[in-house]
């Protein structure tokens, strides 16, 4: 996805997303199924709040290196069996034990958001693509929220902070090699990816869809460049 096109950074597709998507399609069970060889704790595994995580980090406490489990988007997608949104949240600790959105993922997403804003402030990246992607996901989430009914696509907070939205918006779609070159083009590009992410998450077969949405968006990049450059010249 990258070396084939040389070292001049002219690869049409985001190489990281191509690698991830190829691995996911080729070995779906291997990278999505985690089998614990033994119980990590004597009691039922509990989610840690922020204070407990910081206490474990900065105190000399013996704990497992990591705990694996379903993401918030996976829990929501496969628990939405005719239940109201409030019922899904009450029945799953990943939601009910959260500080304000989703246990664990909320702080990860906020960290990516802070890092992304820093990149914009320091002008490492521009605001166009991230704002368009986040805005389109937020708009569709509000449009199809349906007051939390059993047919709801999930809240805007779930879609913004429950998956890889912030990572994708600030650190992946801003790849200069595979994204449009003009500001208007980047807005169109980010909007397309945001719409695709929401469609695949809600009606597709994958709970998160950043990689596939970005690759599909990369297909449109040459056309976006052509259209926006012609508009700029005219």
Predicted regions and their residues:
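C-terminal ends of transmembrane helices
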Residues: 1-9, 114-124, 170-179
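Long hydrophobic alpha-helical segments that form multi-pass transmembrane helix bundles
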Residues: 9-113
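Loop-to-transmembrane alpha-helix initiation sites
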Residues: 12-16, 157-165, 186, 204-215
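Hydrophobic core segments of alpha-helical transmembrane domains in multi-pass membrane transport
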Residues: 21-28, 109-120, 133-142, 167-172, ...
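Hydrophobic alpha-helical transmembrane segments in multi-pass integral membrane proteins
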Residues: 29-36, 144-150, 154-155, 196-208
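Short hydrophobic alpha-helical membrane-embedded segments
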Residues: 90-91, 102-112, 129-131, 162-163, ...
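A beta-strand-loop signature enriched in Asp, Gly, Thr, and Trp
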Residues: 130-133, 138-183
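Cytosolic-side transmembrane-helix boundaries in multi-pass membrane proteins
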Residues: 200-234
């Amino acid at each position: 996805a990258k070396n084939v096109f040389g070292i001049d950074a002219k690869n049409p597709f985001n190489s990281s997303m191509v690698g991830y998507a190829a691995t996911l399609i080729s070995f779906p069970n291997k990278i999505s199924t985690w089998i614990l060889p033994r119980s990590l704790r004597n009691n039922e595994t509990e989610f840690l709040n922020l204070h407990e995580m910081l206490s474990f980090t900065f105190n000399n406490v013996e704990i497992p290196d990591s705990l694996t489990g379903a993401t918030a988007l996976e829990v929501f997608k496969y628990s939405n069996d005719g239940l109201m949104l409030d019922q899904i949240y009450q029945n799953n600790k990943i939601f009910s034990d959260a500080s304000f959105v989703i246990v664990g993922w909320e702080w990860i997403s906020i960290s990516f958001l802070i890092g992304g804003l820093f990149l914009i402030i320091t002008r490492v990246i521009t605001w166009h693509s991230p704002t368009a992607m986040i805005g389109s996901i937020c708009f569709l989430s509000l449009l199809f929220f349906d007051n939390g009914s059993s047919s709801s696509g999930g809240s805007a907070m779930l879609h913004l902070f429950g998956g890889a939205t912030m990572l994708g918006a600030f650190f992946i779609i801003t790849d200069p090699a595979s994204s449009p070159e003009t500001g208007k083009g980047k807005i169109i590009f980010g909007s397309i990816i945001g719409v695709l992410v929401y469609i695949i998450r809600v009606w597709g077969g994958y709970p998160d869809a950043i990689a596939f949405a970005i690759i599909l968006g990369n297909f449109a990049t040459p056309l976006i460049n052509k259209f926006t450059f012609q508009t700029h010249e005219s």
